[in-house]
């Protein structure tokens, strides 16, 4: 019987969630806005670090289903990359297809959480995989 091997190619992100009463949207009809005064220093009530990104989330999901899973993506050599790699390792996702370089910066998101559960995401997209097209080719993908 052939064992399925999952290959997840794409983004991995470190997320930081900031929540609290300071994020209270003002609504104009059905559209709500968060108004943050420039120059203010705001205190948040909640701080949570996590990891995500489409390919990383898929890889973790498959690994939790006891499928052999490999992640291919570009990461920097920064604290966000360390968090991503630690989480993938904890979840038993193979990272032999990861390319890490000081010339890249790992994707990073700051998620502002309103008490209602609504969120606003500030996202820095790291190096696009399209900048390394040779990273994913048939020679790098092993299978039956």
Residue spans of the language-model regions?
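A glycine-rich helix N-cap at a beta->alpha junction
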Residues: 87-104
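Glycine-rich phosphate/adenosyl-contacting loop at the front of the ribokinase-like
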Residues: 1-70
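Short hydrophobic segments within beta-strands
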Residues: 9-12, 72-74, 113, 122
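Conserved phosphate-binding/catalytic loop of the ribokinase/pfkB sugar-kinase fold
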Residues: 96-101, 111-144
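Short secondary-structure boundary/capping elements
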Residues: 47-57, 80, 102-103, 128-133
């Amino acid at each position: 019987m052939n064992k399925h091997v999952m290959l997840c190619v794409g983004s991995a992100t470190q997320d930081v969630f900031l929540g609290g009463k300071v994020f209270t949207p003002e609504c104009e009809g059905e559209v709500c806005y968060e108004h943050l005064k420039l120059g203010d220093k705001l205190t948040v009530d909640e701080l949570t670090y996590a990891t995500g990104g489409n390919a990383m989330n898929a890889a973790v999901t498959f690994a939790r289903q006891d499928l052999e899973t490999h992640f291919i993506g570009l990461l920097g050599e920064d604290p966000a990359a360390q968090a991503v790699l630690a989480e993938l390792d904890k979840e038993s996702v193979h990272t032999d297809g990861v390319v890490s370089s000081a010339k890249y910066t790992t994707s990073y998101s700051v998620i502002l959480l309103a008490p209602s559960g609504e969120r606003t995401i500030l996202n820095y997209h790291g190096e696009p995989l399209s900048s390394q097209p040779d990273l994913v080719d048939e020679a790098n993908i092993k299978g039956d």
